[in-house]
């Protein structure tokens, strides 16, 4: 199976300690769709200051979304109960619907029923994170203004997956606005 981001490319961008792989196994409890499971075992998830994977070594919190939020956070919608936590990105808990492979964001401090779809799948999430990491490493090298650089990055992410920019308040729109404002 081929993916938009190769294992070698992800390792080159994030380094040996910046990629988390998941073992691929067959069992009745393995609820991941095949493409997602293959991607996570072959390519992996980044783990750095931008995206903090919950599956990295030493993580003691559960990856089950139902165990993630406290009662004070509100009631988790029923459709979200089987979802898994992938990590943190832009003040949001990032979760995975294991049946569809879709990736969702729960904004920090937001009502739980206001979650939004962030990416069509894990591959798209990792593709965008990979592009963002490369952008951050080279943004000061470019002769073009920051606005143009951000728009180029937005177009490259959008060409692969339109979902990250459908909502004006999506984590990706907020992050790229912060880059333009000089916060990142």
Sequence positions of predicted segments:
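Compact, glycine/acidic-enriched structural inserts
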Residues: 105-141
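Soluble C-terminal extramembrane regulatory/interaction domains of multi-pass membrane proteins
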Residues: 142-147
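A surface-exposed partner-binding patch
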Residues: 1-100, 158-184
